[in-house]
Amino acid sequence: MAGGGQGRVAVIGASGYGGLQTIRLLQDHPSLTVTFLGGERSAGRRWSSICSFLPLPEDPVVQSADAERIAAAADYAVLSLPNGLACQLAPELLQRGVRVVDLSADFRYRSLEQWSQVYAQEANRLSREDSELCQQAVYGLPEWHGPAIAEARLVAAPGCFPTASLLPLLPFLKQGLIDTDGIVIDAKTGTSGGGRVPKEAMLLAEASESIAPYGVIGHRHTSEIEQMAREVAGQDVRLQFTPHLVPMVRGLLSTVYARLRDPGLTAEDCTTVLEAVYRHHPCVSVLPVGTYPATKWARHTNRALVSVQVDTRTGQMILMSAIDNLIKGQAGQGVQCLNLMHGLPPETGLPLQSFYP
């Protein structure tokens, strides 16, 4: 239904953070309308009894995620489900002609074998036989895969850490300006990145007034970042990635360290590289040399703010990126993909300016 009038969207996992953000973003969208709310724990309940803070017209009832019902109500489905669930529903939707944007990690890997290794806990309780579908899925980073997303039946939206890290990094890998070994990514995110299901580490008493690393070796997003980096660089890329939990609700800051192959390159040169790549992408803003992004600047927007500095003493390039982890890092990026699939400019209906402070 690309570009053909109002697009009907089903949001599955509607009461989780990703689902809530998707619904909120689509409330004011000129060309996409939410026509189906799906969920298992909330099935059968009126929306107002679950999320009274986000009123919806006619107070719809959340329904179970039945593929037949979804296909009758929607042209597109956004799956905001825990890992290991979307891969069970997506094939049924695709068979019925529903185009899918998956916010989980189920289809982010080209290889089902690699997904099974990285997401071993989920793989142990599933019997997946959809390796062909994994290969067909388009990695939903709109600034890099826009034309493919527009034609895709199944889009796998990237994780929040990969989004914030890849956007500043990929232009330099593409042009061969940095070494592909020794890349270090240091990232910080707020507590909403852990989802809406209660977790001990996300309790106020645990997270407040504290910063802590987690997943120090082998975090799941490491291999996801490496996969995309490898495809763009055309060679193997190995990097070190360490995330940190910081005491704020939303926002993500990624700092990437890489060694320049040409020690004569300046911060101005590197900024020009970023500007050339993202000049026509309104959801990415390249900051002037010496201006470094803050998460508050991106809060509640679908913008990624990127900046670069060069340490001439060490030959290191420092890339910085700030996003809202729930918008550009999740639901907003999903809507970007929906826009492309519906034949619209990717930024349609998405907030690009924050309220400050």
From Swiss-Prot:
The keyword Amino-acid biosynthesis applies. Keywords: Amino-acid biosynthesis, Arginine biosynthesis, Cytoplasm, NADP, Oxidoreductase. GO terms for cellular component: cytoplasm. Its main location: cytoplasm. It is an enzyme of class 1 (oxidoreductase). The keyword Chloroplast does not apply. It is found in: Cytoplasm. One of its GO terms (molecular function) is N-acetyl-gamma-glutamyl-phosphate reductase activity. PROSITE patterns: ARGC (PS01224). HAMAP family: ArgC_type1 (MF_00150). Belongs to the NAGSA dehydrogenase family. Type 1 subfamily. This is N-acetyl-gamma-glutamyl-phosphate reductase. It comes from Parasynechococcus marenigrum (strain WH8102). The gene is argC.
